[in-house]
């Protein structure tokens, strides 16, 4: 059975919501899917004062968890065009896995959330360098996903990966089209992982 990990960091719940949709898409293929999050780095009082959603159901991952999966789908909000520091910190702890080549040949994919759309693709690309160093086979979101080419409304996502636009104040949660793209990406990644691990 194909094993997929959806690994994310979410401050305000947008990426958490997308992670659940990505996982649903992957599960639709019959894959075993786990959802985990990376550790929060902010002191608890600072996080609470900033409105960070601390009560998330997903367990906290450890870097060694990554070796147990055929595919890892990473999710992070945009921070000035890059992944969040919490995700960067987690990936920086995978040096031992890199030295041993433990992630070579696994599928890697990325999804994101932005306030107004700026940084969507650069955030995903900020993952790609690390994933390539580890030897991941990187998978995006192809145009066979019909919602990707639909321009009837403002939405996140690109061929690099699914995304959501939260609004400058964070009040907008993922739309139906963004959810459809997330599910498509999860399904697409799981299907490719199944083919490569057969």
UniProtKB/Swiss-Prot annotation:
GO molecular function, one term: flavin adenine dinucleotide binding
Domain of life: Bacteria
Manganese keyword on record: no
Keywords: Flavoprotein, FMN, NAD, NADP, Nucleotide-binding, Oxidoreductase
A cellular component term, taken from the record's GO annotations: membrane
Note on how the cofactor is bound: Binds 1 FMN per monomer.
Cofactor names: FMN
Alphabetical list of InterPro entries matching this protein: Flavodoxin/NO_synth (IPR008254), Flavoprotein-like_sf (IPR029039), Flavoprotein_WrbA-like (IPR010089), FMN_Rdtase-like_dom (IPR005025), NQO (IPR037513)
Residues engaged in binding NAD(+): 12
Residues annotated to bind FMN: 10-15, 78-80, 113-118, 133
Extent of the signal sequence: none
Xref: Pfam families: FMN_red
Ligand binding (substrate): 98
HAMAP family, sorted: NQOR
NCBIfam families (alphabetical): flav_wrbA, PRK03767.1
Protein name: NAD(P)H dehydrogenase (quinone)
